[in-house]
Each structure stands twice: as structure tokens, then as C-alpha cells.
Design a protein with these regions (language model features):
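Basic helix-turn-helix/winged-helix DNA-binding cores
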Residues: 1-63
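Short, charged amphipathic alpha-helical surface segments
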Residues: 53, 69-109
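Phosphopantetheinylated carrier protein domains
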Residues: 65-67
Length: 109
């Protein structure tokens, strides 16, 4: 078992975020000492922590990560495809804004 600090170092998730993930039920420690409250994680939970980190980095909200953390590959693939479409739409909007900005800038001269 890994204490929270060691798990934090290995997973690259801050202790504060691990506590938050525990509170919201996203990543529960394998065990927690009833007297001290110390959290201990199993090494096998590092894969789950990695999936959570990747999904966070891709912009998924915590609520959806909770659903996807244990999803099968098909459900995860659909969610990733949906997120890719959202990002592409956002990029398109930003490109249009940039074009508008450049046109406006030329008018200022």
C-alpha cells in the first residue's frame, strides 16, 4: 500500500486533489485508517489515476470523468469522439474571431 504522498508523487496528482477526488467519489483510497484518517492507495490504482489525469487534461469535467473512469472501451471511444468534435468546433470559432480581429485591425490603420 502507498501512503497518499507517495501515491501523489507516482501519479503526479497533488495530495489536495487526491483528497478532493476522494470527497467526490472519483478516486477512493483502497483503505483509510479509522483513527488517523490516513489514506492508503494500492499500486493498481495508478492506472485509474492516470486515466483520470488524461481525461482532465483533455478538458472533461469531473462529473463526466467519474462516469468514464470505469467505462468500457466503446463508451470511452464515443466520449473521446464527442470531445474531439467539441474542440474542433471551438477551434473553428476561435479562427473566425482571429480573422475578424485581423480585419478590424486593418481598418484601424
Amino acid at each position: 500500500m502507498l501512503q497518499i504522498g507517495e501515491f501523489s508523487r507516482l501519479s503526479r496528482i497533488s495530495v489536495r486533489m487526491l483528497r478532493h477526488y476522494d470527497q467526490v467519489g472519483l478516486l477512493k483510497p483502497a483503505e483509510q485508517d479509522a483513527q488517523t484518517g490516513y489514506r492508503r492507495y494500492a499500486a493498481s490504482q495508478l492506472a485509474e489515476a492516470n486515466r483520470i489525469t488524461v481525461l482532465r487534461d483533455l478538458g472533461f469535467p469531473i462529473r463526466e470523468i467519474g462516469r468514464l473512469a470505469h467505462a468500457d472501451d466503446g463508451e470511452l471511444a464515443r466520449a473521446l469522439d464527442d470531445r474531439a468534435r467539441e474542440l474542433e468546433e471551438g477551434i473553428g470559432r476561435e479562427q473566425r474571431r482571429l480573422a475578424d480581429l485581423r480585419r478590424f485591425r486593418q481598418e484601424v490603420e
